[in-house]
Regions:
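Gly/Ser/Thr-rich loops at beta-strand to alpha-helix junctions
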Residues: 1, 17-25, 120, 163-165, ...
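Short, acidic/small-residue loops that bind anionic groups at enzyme active sites
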Residues: 2-28, 38-44
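Flexible, glycine/proline-enriched loop segments at strand-loop-helix junctions
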Residues: 14-18, 50-59, 211-222, 297
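Short Gly/Pro-enriched loop/turn and capping motifs at secondary-structure junctions
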Residues: 21-25, 49-50, 344-346, 428-430
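Short low-complexity, flexible loop/linker segments enriched in glycine and/or proline
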Residues: 30-34
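A charged, well-structured terminal subsegment
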Residues: 45-80
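Non-transmembrane, aqueous-exposed alpha-helical and coiled segments at domain scale
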Residues: 85-463
Length: 463
């Protein structure tokens, strides 16, 4: 809404954005990022979702309306920030503790010790890319800072990455800057956190863990690169708690995971990256934002048919309000992700099933009654009545959502089989799956190729 207000103000049209009082700080910080630190906002007392109709009306008339009128007649005082230091400016000097205290006090760290980004360390990272340090990959909302190669190296140093990780970091920020991903939603209420999936030769070149404990910290590439992602969101995009990051509870950054491509080759399955058009042998990163997840232990059975009920149930139980990204706010943007332990994938593939077959079965059988789907939409959106039949007849959703008028008819969670994402990773001998709850259009899956510099493999070998 603030972006619409900024566009109106830029065109000379007065505006006033209604903002719940818990988001006033976010509005002020976002206005600065939009280049209009005096963007007019009007406070909405409390939260409308927990107020009676009478209380809401009284608060709007007594508080909000007056602010709206003032905003349309005069601009509020500026809340702008001072000038920021240049890319190569020295901002602090001292020992390890002094530097860490400075970065923490100025909101530049995640609360854990950082590696001081000295010029020497930053330049070591730059030797692992052929790109100009001043090149910008795009302006990242909400602060509209340029995502430069230099700033990628700086935050990579701080996160504890090794210099040879630089090509991965660049690919990640290319993905972050992709409009399809929606970085501007990174601080929204559910507090979703991005998961990074790595594919290709770079997995072994850099030593990523892709077996037991794949989502656990303790493996440097997985851990440091996951930490880098959150540091970059803070320091460049501008997502800081109590400011632009308004997650109600939030999540801690996730370690990056890698697929077990040895197992994929053995069973004849394509990698996750193939779903995004990449060829075998391409090193890639895939990002998407998830609000939670659930581990399903002991998926038992000697055949796919005996295993699949566990998988259907796992997907169904993970999704409630997120169905608004299937029908509603996101309209077809829900992308559930399922991690399969190698023994599960190998058993399913052993009966001749492909990844495509597995996705098709999930689409056909992981379903809920239409009346339940409509109830979830009614309860979790502001629209009091939902009718899947009307949506399908109007052509807004696929016809599979209205194959009959039976309110108990099973309907899918997504629009088509290809909407499911699969990755094979984790303990080689455990029969488990993990299902992530996707945040839809507010963190849509994006994949980018990792491009090594000239003689990149040689540089990586030599460290």
């Amino acid at each position: 809404v603030l972006r619409a207000s900024a566009a109106g103000e830029a065109a000379g049209v007065p505006s006033s954005t209604l903002v719940c009082e818990g988001f006033m700080g976010l509005a002020a910080a976002s206005s600065i990022g939009l280049g209009m630190p005096n963007l007019p906002v009007a406070r909405v007392v409390g939260h409308p979702g927990v107020q009676s109709k009478e209380m809401l009306e009284r608060n709007v008339l007594e508080v909000t309306l007056e602010a709206v009128i003032d905003n349309l007649l005069k601009a509020p005082k500026s809340t702008g920030k001072g000038d920021e230091p240049g890319a190569r400016d020295v901002i602090a000097k001292g020992g390890f503790q002094e530097i860490n205290d400075y970065f923490y006090d100025h909101g530049l760290s995640d609360g854990l010790p950082i590696v001081p980004p000295t010029r020497e360390k930053v330049e070591a990272f730059l030797r692992f890319t052929d790109r100009d340090p001043g090149e910008s990959l795009g302006a990242l909302l909400p602060d509209s800072r340029a995502a430069t190669i230099w700033s990628i190296a700086v935050n990579g140093v701080m996160a504890g990455c090794r210099p040879e990780y630089m090509p991965v970091l660049v690919a990640l920020i290319e993905a972050m800057a992709d409009p399809a991903y929606g970085v501007e939603h990174s601080g929204n209420t559910p507090g979703g956190e991005t998961l990074i999936i790595v594919n290709g030769p770079v997995i072994k070149q850099l030593g990523f863990n892709y077996t037991q404990g794949v989502m656990r910290d303790g493996f440097r590439p997985n851990t440091a690169i996951g930490r880098f992602w959150r540091l970059y969101l803070r320091n460049v995009a501008g997502f800081l708690p109590h400011q632009n990051d308004k997650a109600t509870f939030g999540n801690t950054w996730r370690v990056a995971i890698a697929e077990n491509e040895d197992l994929l080759k053995k069973i004849g399955w394509e990698a996750n990256s193939a779903d995004f058009g990449f060829a075998p042998g391409d090193s890639t990163v895939t990002i998407a934002r998830y609000t939670g997840g659930n581990h399903i232990s002991s998926v038992s059975g000697a055949t796919p048919e005996s295993m699949m009920p566990y998988l259907y149930d796992a997907v169904i139980r993970q999704y409630s309000w997120q169905l608004m990204f299937t029908v509603g706010q996101g309209m077809g943007t829900l992308r559930p992700l399922m991690l399969l332990s190698p023994i599960i994938a190998e058993t399913i593939a052993g009966w001749g099933w492909s990844r495509r077959d597995l996705k098709r079965r999930l689409f056909e059988h992981a379903r809920i009654p239409a009346r339940e789907f409509e109830r979830i939409l009614r309860d979790w959106t502001q629209k009091p009545t939902w009718n899947l039949a009307e949506e399908a007849r109007a052509g807004r959703i696929p016809k599979v959502f209205h194959e009959s008028d039976d309110p108990g008819r099973p309907v899918p969670l997504v629009w088509k089989p290809e909407d499911y994402m699969l990755a094979v990773t984790g303990d080689l001998t455990r029969n488990s799956v993990y299902v992530f709850a996707h945040n839809g259009v507010l963190g849509y899956p994006v994949a980018k190729r990792i491009r090594l510099p000239r003689d990149g493999e040689g540089r990586i070998r030599n460290g």
